[in-house]
Amino acid sequence: MFDFEELRELARYRDERNLVCSCYYPLEKGEPAGEGALIRLKNLINGALADREDWTGSQYKSVSEDLARIEILVAEELVLSSGGLAVFAASTAGLWKVFHLPVKCGPMLVVDRTTRIRPMIEFLDRYRRYCTVLVGKGKARIFLLDPGGVEE
């Protein structure tokens, strides 16, 4: 999961020289790659690369490398994880953040000078963390619940 401080840090990210890739992708544990999931991702990547307007050569190279890295990550996570994946990448600026979300999100891929965090904000608004206390004779238990699970 992630916390509000990480979200604030991503929200403040802005770089006039480098482009950042914001990718949200739904995962289904054990989904075979041949089922079209990777084809959908490849179509998103091709669309993002085709939409370049004022990118420099170095920006294009950086974005291409970041998108290739995201593609490899998604291919691995499709087999291992379920829920959703949020990735923020700008390798020339040293940004590589991966968040595993307990619910599906996306698919969405945006290349811009800022991060696209609206889906994560909506996720936090929809699935808030809450606390439950069980009190018994001489004993109490505190549980923190969020979409990622229960913590005692």
Predicted regions span which residues?
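Non-catalytic, solvent-exposed interaction/assembly segments
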Residues: 1-123
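Gly/Thr-rich phosphate-binding beta-strand-loop-beta motif of the actin/hexokinase/Hsp70
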Residues: 126-151
